[in-house]
């Protein structure tokens, strides 16, 4: 499922003022990763978001005064008076300011519990059963250095004459935090931070800014620059030499995050590995954040599909590069899979990766938000898997609710939209038999999950 960081230049300047410090106890962690503390203000309760705090901690903090009538307020942490036993030392020097991570102060057990509870809250909000919810699986890849770290990142870059800034924005602000390290990123990306600054010096003029999308692939870093100005002749002459020197396979440019990337220079096609298959990587294409997370999601999906029996005919909706299509085809030599997505470049890559499967794979470009698969199109289908972006798959869930498909598997990166879609399936006669959270976003509030529904 896709995650999109707000592009640089679209953030507002926020210079809050604060009331006098108060002391309170953190009740729980909210969906943003902030601790919740309730304070009394002239007889009214105000719920305060206090960053970098944990449940049970006694903390001193100051509440923003920008909206004195609000019953929910942001706050800044002053000090932790009584720390939680789950509190740990942050791994990164930039944690207090950078917008990339929210939970570096929490032990892995506390993060897993938070992500499980985040899914539980979403289910409760839709009056859905929680007895089928399993504890979150942590899939950061710590036990395998080759799997550790996020293999896709997007940094903001700014050229200030002699000074190049590269990093992430402070939460709710247009202030760019210039980073010297990023332990959440794959080592191939973190080690290349000086090289990315060198790229910025070549690609940007003084006063310019851009976003730099970086994907760690099997054969080097795949780079996409997002900026308004099209690359000039000098850049098109200089950048290939730079890329060749760094051993990076491709550099692309786009004018906005919605525009298709244009290749500036490419020495080879970047690839990623999915269940043993080498899949060509579209520029700025979507892949799961970590290879360990990808494997955990595949394992969860394949266990459910296996229970449907041999030769099951499957639809893989929002299939992308084939995260589930490829292992589905590999697992059962008699299985047929219909794969669908609106991203044509991803479908092209999937066809290339699955060339050995011949007619067992059917690929269809389709906008599933406007044109979902309806019940009559799903006759004879044994299993449907859908893995939509954060917005969820409301239209497709409504259509599935009217179908006779025996098994539906929902993969989601947003517990709230998942719970909404799950309610539609249950109202249509499905039983939710399992919900498995998967934590592949180390130190972030983002939560993946895999859920099974049967008739």
Range-by-range predicted roles:
Residues 56, 185, 290:
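Short, conserved phosphate/pyrophosphate- and ester-handling motifs at nucleotide-, phospho-/glycolipid
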Residues 78-90, 96-205, 209:
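Extended interfacial segments that mediate partner engagement and assembly in macromolecular machines
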Residues 136-145, 211-213, 256-260, 436-440:
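Short, solvent-exposed loop/turn elements at beta->coil junctions and helix N-caps
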Residues 27, 62-67, 156-160, 215-217, ...:
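Short beta-strand micro-motifs enriched in acidic
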Residues 135, 207-217, 251:
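A short glycine-rich, hydrophobically flanked beta-strand micro-motif that places a catalytic Asp/Glu
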Residues 1-22, 31, 202, 228-455:
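Rossmann-like S-adenosyl-L-methionine
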Residues 151, 221, 311-312:
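Nucleotide donor/acceptor-binding cores
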Residues 1-94, 173, 315:
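Terminal RNA-binding accessory module
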């Amino acid at each position: 499922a896709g995650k999109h960081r707000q592009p640089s230049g679209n953030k507002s300047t926020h210079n809050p003022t604060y009331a006098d410090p108060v002391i309170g106890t953190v009740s729980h962690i909210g969906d943003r990763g902030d601790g919740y503390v309730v304070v009394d203000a002239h007889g009214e309760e105000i719920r305060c978001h206090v960053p970098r705090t944990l449940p049970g901690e006694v903390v001193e903090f100051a509440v923003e005064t920008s909206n004195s009538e609000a019953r929910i307020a942001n706050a800044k942490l002053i000090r932790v008076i009584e720390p939680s036993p789950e509190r740990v030392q942050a791994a990164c020097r930039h944690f207090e300011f950078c917008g990339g991570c929210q939970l570096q102060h929490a032990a892995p057990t506390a993060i897993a519990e938070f992500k499980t509870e985040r899914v539980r809250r979403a289910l409760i909000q839709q009056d859905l059963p929680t007895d089928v919810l399993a504890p979150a699986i942590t899939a950061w890849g710590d036990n395998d250095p080759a799997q550790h770290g996020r293999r896709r990142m997007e940094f903001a870059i700014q050229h200030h004459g002699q000074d190049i800034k590269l990093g992430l924005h402070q939460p709710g602000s247009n202030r760019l935090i210039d980073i010297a390290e990023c332990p959440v990123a794959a080592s191939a990306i973190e080690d290349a931070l000086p090289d990315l600054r060198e790229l910025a010096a070549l690609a940007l003029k003084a006063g310019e800014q851009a976003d730099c999308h970086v994907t760690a692939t099997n054969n080097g870093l795949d780079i996409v620059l997002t900026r308004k100005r099209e690359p000039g002749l000098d850049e098109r002459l200089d950048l290939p030499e730079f890329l060749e020197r760094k051993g990076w396979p491709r550099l692309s440019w786009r004018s906005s995050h919605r525009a298709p990337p244009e290749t500036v220079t490419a020495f080879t096609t970047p690839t990623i590995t999915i269940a043993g298959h080498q899949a060509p990587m579209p520029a700025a294409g979507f892949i799961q954040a970590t290879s360990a997370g990808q494997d955990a999601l595949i394992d969860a999906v394949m266990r459910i599909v296996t229970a449907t029996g041999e030769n099951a005919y499957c639809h893989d909706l929002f299939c992308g590069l084939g995260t589930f299509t490829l292992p589905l085809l590999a697992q059962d030599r008699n299985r047929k899979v219909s794969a669908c997505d609106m991203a044509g470049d991803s479908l092209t890559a999937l066809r290339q990766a699955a060339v050995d499967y011949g007619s067992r794979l059917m690929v269809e470009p389709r906008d599933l938000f406007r044109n979902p698969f309806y019940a009559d199109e799903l006759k004879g289908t044994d299993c449907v898997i859908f893995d939509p972006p954060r917005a969820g798959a409301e239209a497709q869930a409504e259509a599935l609710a009217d179908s006779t498909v025996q098994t539906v598997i929902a993969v989601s990166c947003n517990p709230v939209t998942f719970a909404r879609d799950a309610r539609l399936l249950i109202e249509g006669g499905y039983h939710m038999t399992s919900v498995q959270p998967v934590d592949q976003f180390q130190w972030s509030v983002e939560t993946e999950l895999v859920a099974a529904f049967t008739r």
